[in-house]
UniProtKB/Swiss-Prot annotation:
Gene Ontology molecular-function annotations: 3'-nucleotidase activity; 5'-nucleotidase activity; exopolyphosphatase activity; metal ion binding; nucleotide binding
Protein EC: 3.1.3.5
InterPro entries documented for this protein: SurE, SurE-like_Pase/nucleotidase, SurE-like_sf
Protein name: 5'-nucleotidase SurE
Highest taxon in the source lineage: Bacteria
Pfam families listed in its UniProt record: SurE
Cell location: Cytoplasm
Co-factor: note: Binds 1 divalent metal cation per subunit.
Function, as annotated: Nucleotidase that shows phosphatase activity on nucleoside 5'-monophosphates.
């Protein structure tokens, strides 16, 4: 397959380099990724300044382009302007740390995959689910095997797979689980500090809230050393609430 690879940790990050080299064993890989880290940029795109593309070498077999933009920018630019062949799959990652629960709302990694989905390409976001000890090799090996097993062309439109791989050796993975997005989120707070000139600034911290009791969630799967595979959708309408809201606001109309 012709695969476009991006990330939000930056084109020099180990995760994307390990991923690109592993995928290049069986596929044609084009890397288009931010020139610096763009973590937690969400689905931002650049519309007021130009985008620059600098060719770089990623591993031994892969051509890459460093972009002064976001992951979503990279996917747009890669598909529409840089690639001289048809992109068949977008892969975003390997992210350093998990993208579970509400992480996906902020994640540049997940947004890169969702941008691919919006552009009607099968898309995957993949994360090594440990900030302190990410097992990029495990995640890369898993994805290469997964692509041999799963036909990405069967994915419905505007859908991406959010994959979180536990931070263990490949032999220790118990398998995979198709999961739902958990309610894992954060209780945020800000610490007020002063710079050397006496000016106030704020540094954000967050405590993880894991109050989702279900065993079918992304977090529950990763906790038990299963790879979590969650189908996510580009459109965010709450279909379950629509009938009730319609009745309350429109009545019989």
């Amino acid at each position: 397959m012709n695969i476009l690879v991006t990330n939000d940790d930056g084109i020099m990050a180990p995760g994307i380099n390990i991923l690109a080299q592993k995928l290049a064993e069986k596929h044609s890989v084009l890397v288009v990724a931010p020139d610096v880290e763009r973590s937690a940029t969400g689905h931002a795109i650049t519309i007021r300044t130009p985008l620059w593309a600098k060719e770089v070498k990623v591993g031994e077999k892969t051509v890459g382009y460093a972009i002064n933009g976001t992951p979503a920018d990279c996917v747009k630019l890669g598909i529409l302007a840089i690639a001289d062949f048809e992109i068949e799959l977008v892969v975003s990652g390997i992210n350093k740390g998990p993208n579970l629960g509400t992480d996906i709302l902020y994640s540049g990694t997940v947004s890169g995959a969702l941008e691919g989905a919006v552009m009607e390409k099968p898309s995957i976001a993949i994360s090594a689910a440990d900030w302190n000890n990410p097992k990029y090799e495990t995640a890369a090996e898993f994805l290469l095997e997964f692509l041999d097993t799963y036909d990405v062309t069967k994915m419905p439109e505007f859908t991406a797979l959010n994959i979180n791989v536990p931070s263990v050796d490949r032999a220790e993975l118990k398998g995979w689980k198709v999961t739902r997005q958990s309610r894992r989120r954060y209780r945020d707070y800000f610490e007020k500090r002063k710079d050397p000139y006496g000016n106030n600034y704020y540094w954000m911290f967050g405590e993880i809230i894991e109050d989702d009791p279900g065993e079918d969630s992304d977090y529950a799967a990763v906790r038990r050393n299963y790879v979590s595979i969650t189908p996510i959708y580009a459109f965010m309408t709450n279909q379950n609430y629509m009938p009730k809201l319609k009745e309350e606001l429109e009545g019989g109309n």
